[in-house]
């Protein structure tokens, strides 16, 4: 539930470099960068900006979710550690 709540607050920035068939989706939690997804097609004739954004975001969402699990897991582990004195 915590990861889903965090994912609901992720903001997205998109890039489509001019002259390419590449699209990038960048995920941010506040000002903290989480992940980037990328999509591209071989043929410029087949390039569709909307599909590029969709596929790049899908990839970035998976990476962002994985990063949040990693960070939340670390935060939990750190809160449970007892340092030897």
Regions from the PLM with identified roles:
Residues 1-85:
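Domain-level marker for long, solvent-exposed, non-transmembrane regions
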């Amino acid at each position: 539930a915590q990861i889903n709540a965090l994912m609901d607050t992720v903001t997205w920035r998109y890039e489509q470099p001019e002259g390419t068939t590449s699209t990038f989706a960048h995920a941010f939690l506040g000002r903290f960068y989480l992940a980037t997804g990328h999509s591209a097609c071989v043929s410029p004739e087949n390039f569709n900006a909307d599909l590029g954004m969709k596929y790049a975001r899908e990839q970035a969402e998976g990476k962002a979710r994985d990063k949040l699990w990693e960070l939340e897991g670390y935060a939990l582990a750190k809160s449970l550690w007892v340092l030897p004195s």
